[in-house]
């Protein structure tokens, strides 16, 4: 592809980005053209890979939204319908449904007698029927990591929307139990509160199943799920900064000291959390209204005599604020006499039990009074958002099978939409499918251990399989069982370094004075601070990926198998993940050796990956054992990527600096995007801007273009300068910006060319051209990984492999797409091999070659 054609394509992506970003109006009623009714069964073809299957003895089908599904009005895909005396047939390009007319699709025991669907995955069929177990499901998430000890929570994780079986199901029937024991109610707009409210289902005994037959196209499965279940809202910008949080009986002076220490130590911070001791009864069991003082609504004026003034002071220092809530026991007269009196009068004594108005959020009158008298009052004092911790019942004691966790999230988030000029955001527990609409998750009280840390990378990325893309963890761990690890500097450092590459960056611990979370108190604070600064550098990239999550349903943290579904290592190396489109992360979750080094085995997928801390380009697919100092983090940029960074001077992610750093990995054509908006504007769906970046390599010339800003945004700077950091380059000979000579330099140790792009208008394209002393490499700079080719020749039906040097031992394994091995062979002292595949059945295969402990994988279609 020529440079000119490449840039024409790259800039077309801006238009595509803008087009994809338009908001969708949810409509739970499917187009009639998508519906097929056969007696008491109804089938709705939503996409070529997704079909809704309903069965109701009274043909009472559900056309309203539910807790899980909001929108069924999608473009009708092409499908055919036919029938004979016995069966109804529906066929799309990916699904073949066969239904025995007049029967309940559900059989006991589960079988394909009455209904089966054949799913096509690269031409390989897989059969689903109602009730079929799915041991290959790739899982989603779970409600809490409370008590996490290593792998202890893996067995609690719910099924996700993707599976190596090629299919997954959403059981949205009333009879299906959600994560906290509740059921999926209908949602109907309620004029009293101004948003959707729970309602009984049309038929509580009906079958309501969504079959997702996406094969290994996992990204499309998750993306299409958000088309029916609602988008992942874009949080306000400040939530992506550092949160200071600790469960402690902090006084107002303690908070002032913490803010002063953060400033003195130059620690970028955006959020200050006030845990439960902000209210009465936090530790005073003698005044407890119920469960040890967890619930409270009135300021503890012994600790915080002027809460409004304190919050104003926090705001003046650029901290956003959140209060912790445990709604459990309602509003107690002793703890909150003023609020109690106001609500008792509002409700005419309703919900009163003794001296407590019981927690009754499933009723609109209680909800209106509660938010008007308590929540709005605190918000007027300066509370920016709420942390919904947990002590309430799993399900409502008043409304059968109403999930308290999900319903709290739904109500608090929708109430937050009423705040003018602010984006709704809450910090909460997972409440089952549909919870992604309420953004930020609080994962809970993990134990302080390397084993708990090691589980969290897998847990965070896997949650994307249900669209739950904003888990926030207790970085450093919550409570301890091992005295040696209470304030272990290495463990805290590695947890924070992992946190840099997670959606929410928040340290926390329980109310134990022995546990320290003031990071400036640790002996390795300078190294910890470097991690915090890296987080702030990454903000433009993170925020751009957050916008992409809103537009596409793809979370920031994603499993490797989204991109490499045919490669077994993408599943087995589950401590690695993608952080957005272009960064591969393999966090260190083990303690350092006595020499201060830590070894980490990393699997690199196909492609080439720039090791940011070791300054080398690594050719995948391969496995490498790498050594890291405490200061280093295993993260890697995809070759061709352009990743925007903030300058190191930024102290708040709410800043919009007029200087930006672009990290460019040379050697391949590529592009990147910078998303910009006002940070907290609720109209971000339409009010935003993008700047596109592109690079093209041709011979000894690198061409790098910064496009003009497209779109509307108020807070972004009109003018900006850039610094290009171009990695994997030979020595530069010259550099120009829009034809004018530019300042440049070269670091041979980092193989990095730096070019300064002068301060100028963001409404003008800027083209940087760099001439190099040698041809720009599209291969590895480091020679530590060997190159290999695997080619399937269609004419001869032979698979051929070749290496760049002789291999002592080579093992070949060929499997079909279902994972069944169909051929194995080994070779010794070879630099090539050939296998005749004439006898193999025509279909997709995966060839895996292990040569002297390096692994290579290729997929091919046998003709």
Stretches found by the model and what they are:
Residues 47-85:
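A low-complexity, Ser/Thr/Gly/Pro-enriched, surface-exposed linker/loop concept
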Residues 65-78, 611-630, 734-757:
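Solvent-exposed beta-strand/loop surfaces of large extracellular or lumenal domains
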Residues 1-26:
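Bacterial Sec-dependent N-terminal signal peptides
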Residues 6, 17-20, 776-863:
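C-terminal outer-membrane/trafficking sorting elements
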Residues 120, 128, 268-528, 563-565, ...:
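Aromatic- and carboxylate-enriched substrate-binding clefts and catalytic-loop regions
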């Amino acid at each position: 592809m020529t440079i000119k054609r490449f840039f024409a394509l790259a800039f077309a992506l801006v238009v595509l980005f803008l087009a994809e970003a338009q908001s969708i109006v949810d409509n739970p009623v499917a187009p009639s053209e998508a519906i097929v009714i056969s007696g008491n069964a109804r089938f709705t073809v939503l996409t070529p890979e997704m079909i809704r299957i309903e069965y109701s003895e009274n043909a009472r089908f559900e056309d309203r939204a539910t807790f899980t599904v909001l929108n069924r009005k999608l473009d009708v895909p092409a499908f055919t319908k036919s029938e004979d005396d016995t069966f109804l047939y529906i066929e799309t390009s990916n699904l073949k449904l066969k239904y025995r007319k007049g029967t309940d699709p559900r059989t006991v025991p589960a079988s394909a007698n009455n209904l089966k669907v054949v799913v096509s995955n690269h031409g390989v069929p897989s059969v689903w029927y109602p009730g079929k177990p799915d041991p290959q499901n790739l899982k989603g998430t779970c409600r809490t990591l409370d008590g996490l000890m290593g792998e202890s929570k893996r067995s609690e994780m719910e099924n996700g929307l993707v599976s190596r079986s090629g299919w997954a199901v959403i059981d949205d029937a009333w009879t299906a139990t959600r994560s906290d024991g509740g059921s999926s109610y209908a949602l109907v707009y309620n004029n009293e509160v101004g948003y959707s409210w729970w309602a009984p289902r049309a038929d509580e005994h009906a079958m309501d199943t969504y079959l997702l037959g996406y094969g290994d196209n996992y990204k499309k499965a998750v993306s299409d799920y958000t088309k029916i279940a609602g988008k992942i809202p874009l949080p306000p910008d400040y939530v992506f900064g550092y949160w200071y949080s600790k469960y402690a009986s902090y006084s107002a002076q303690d908070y002032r000291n913490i803010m002063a220490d953060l400033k003195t130590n130059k620690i970028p911070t955006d959020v200050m959390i006030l845990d439960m001791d902000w209210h009465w009864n936090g530790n005073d069991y003698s005044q407890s209204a119920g469960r040890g003082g967890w619930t409270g609504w009135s300021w503890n004026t012994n600790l915080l005599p002027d809460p409004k003034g304190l919050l104003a002071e926090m705001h003046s220092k650029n901290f956003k604020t959140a209060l912790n809530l445990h709604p459990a026991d309602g509003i107690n007269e002793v703890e909150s006499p003023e609020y109690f009196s106001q609500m008792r009068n509002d409700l005419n004594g309703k919900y009163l039990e003794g001296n407590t108005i019981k927690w009754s959020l499933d009723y609109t009158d209680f909800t209106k009074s509660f938010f008007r008298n308590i929540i709005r009052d605190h918000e007027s004092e300066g509370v920016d958002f709420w942390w919904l911790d947990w002590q309430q019942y799993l399900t409502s004691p008043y409304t059968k099978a109403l999930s308290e966790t999900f319903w709290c999230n739904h109500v608090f988030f929708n109430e937050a939409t009423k705040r003018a000029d602010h984006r709704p955001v809450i910090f909460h527990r997972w409440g089952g499918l549909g919870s992604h609409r309420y953004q930020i998750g609080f994962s809970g009280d993990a134990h302080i251990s390397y084993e708990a840390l090691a589980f969290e990378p897998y847990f965070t990325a896997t949650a994307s399989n249900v669209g739950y893309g904003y888990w926030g963890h207790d970085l450093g761990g919550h409570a301890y069982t091992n005295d040696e690890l209470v304030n272990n500097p290495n463990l805290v450092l590695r947890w924070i370094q992992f946190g840099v590459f997670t959606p929410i960056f928040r340290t926390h611990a329980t109310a134990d004075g022995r546990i320290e979370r003031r990071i400036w108190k640790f002996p390795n604070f300078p190294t910890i601070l470097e991690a915090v600064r890296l987080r702030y550098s990454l903000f433009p990239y993170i925020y751009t990926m957050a916008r992409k999550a809103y537009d596409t349903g793809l979370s920031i943290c994603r499993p490797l198998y989204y991109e490499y579904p045919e490669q077994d290592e993408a599943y087995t190396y589950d401590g690695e993940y993608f952080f957005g489109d272009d960064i591969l992360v393999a966090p260190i979750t083990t303690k350092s050796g006595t020499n201060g080094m830590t070894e980490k085995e990393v699997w690199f997928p196909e492609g080439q990956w720039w090791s940011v801390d070791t300054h080398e380009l690594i050719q995948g697919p391969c496995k490498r054992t790498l050594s890291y100092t405490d200061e280093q983090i295993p993260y890697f940029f995809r070759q061709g990527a352009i990743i925007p960074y903030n300058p190191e001077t930024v102290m708040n992610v709410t800043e919009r600096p007029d200087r930006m750093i672009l990290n460019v990995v040379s050697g391949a054509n590529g592009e990147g995007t910078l998303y910009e908006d006002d940070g907290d504007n609720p109209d971000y769906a339409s009010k935003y801007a993008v700047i596109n970046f592109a690079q093209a390599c041709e011979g000894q010339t690198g061409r790098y273009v910064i496009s003009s800003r497209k779109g509307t945004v108020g807070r972004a700077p009109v003018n900006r300068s850039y610094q290009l950091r171009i990695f994997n380059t030979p020595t530069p000979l010259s550099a120009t910006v829009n034809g004018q000579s530019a300042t440049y330099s070269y670091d041979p140790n980092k193989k990095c060319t730096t070019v300064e792009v002068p301060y100028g208008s963001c409404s003008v394209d800027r083209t940087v051209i760099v001439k190099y002393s040698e041809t720009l490499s599209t291969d590895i700079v480091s020679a530590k990984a060997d190159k290999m080719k695997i080619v399937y020749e269609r004419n001869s039906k032979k698979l051929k492999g070749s290496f760049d040097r002789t291999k002592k031992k080579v093992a070949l394994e060929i499997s079909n797409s279902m994972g069944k091995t169909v051929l194995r062979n080994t070779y010794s002292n070879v630099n090539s091999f050939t296998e005749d595949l004439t006898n193999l059945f025509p279909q997709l295969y995966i060839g895996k070659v292990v040569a002297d402990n390096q692994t290579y994988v290729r997929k091919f279609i046998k003709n």
